């Protein structure tokens, strides 16, 4: 017999109250990049340069979190100069690139920001993300994440990575903390 969970209606549809309870405690959102903030595709130019696309809605959600006093960090296994520029544009102060073991960066963030694991949300899309996701208070997988990651996450976004999944999570965090209405009218 399956368990019946209490749900709350949100602009993204019904969400388990347990997820919103966890989101209420979030003081730091950690994002992966490839497959989360981007669609996971890497475009190669004729000169060998790499290009990625980022969703403006995700950027707006991040700015709303930062304006609401919630920290945002990026931990990624790859390294890309364009990511430094994106973080500067959005006001993200915590960028960890080239991290094959994301737990090290995660622990550094906990120490640096004096946070507990229960105050952290992490959004990822692949197995490299699981070690951190298993530690945080709110673990989130994007809709098109690796199939082994989906059942392990506290919440699976309805929107795919690079298409607004981070915005969905930002909105849910703000909604759970009664701050979503304050996000209106901000600009990035």
Task: Give short role names for the model-derived ranges.
Residues 1-31, 179-188:
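Non-catalytic pre-domain segments flanking phosphatase-related domains
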Residues 37-67:
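A positional/architectural concept
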Residues 25-27, 70, 118-119:
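Short coil/turn segments at beta-strand junctions that form active-site/ligand-binding loops
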Residues 15-16, 58, 102:
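Amphipathic coiled-coil/heptad-repeat helices and related helical stalk/stem segments
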Residues 23-42, 133, 166:
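Asp-based phosphoryl-transfer active-site loop
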Residues 6-8, 13, 49-52, 97:
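Short, flexible loop segments at the rims of nucleotide/cofactor-binding pockets, characterized by
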Residues 51-52, 82, 88-90, 94-96, ...:
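Mg2+-dependent phosphoryl-transfer enzymes with acidic/Ser/Thr/Gly-rich catalytic loops
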Residues 62-86, 96-97, 133:
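Substrate-recognition element of Asp-dependent hydrolases with the DxDx(T/V) motif
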């Amino acid at each position: 017999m399956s368990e019946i969970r209490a749900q709350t209606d949100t602009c993204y549809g019904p969400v388990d109250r347990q997820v919103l309870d966890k989101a209420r405690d979030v003081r730091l959102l950690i994002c992966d990049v490839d497959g989360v903030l981007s669609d996971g595709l890497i475009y190669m130019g004729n000169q060998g340069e790499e290009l990625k696309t980022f969703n403006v809605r995700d950027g707006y959600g991040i700015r709303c979190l930062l304006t609401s006093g919630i920290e945002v960090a990026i931990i990624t296994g790859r390294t890309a100069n364009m990511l430094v520029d994106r973080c500067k544009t959005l006001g993200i102060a915590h960028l960890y690139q080239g991290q094959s073991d994301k737990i090290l960066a995660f622990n550094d963030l906990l120490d640096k920001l004096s946070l507990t694991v229960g105050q952290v949300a992490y959004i990822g899309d692949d197995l490299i993300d699981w070690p951190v996701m298993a530690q945080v208070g709110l673990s989130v997988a994007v809709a098109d994440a690796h199939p082994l990651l989906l059942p392990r996450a506290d919440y699976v976004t309805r929107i795919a990575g690079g298409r607004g999944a981070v915005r969905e999570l930002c909105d849910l965090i703000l909604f759970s903390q009664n701050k979503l209405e304050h996000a209106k009218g901000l600009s990035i």
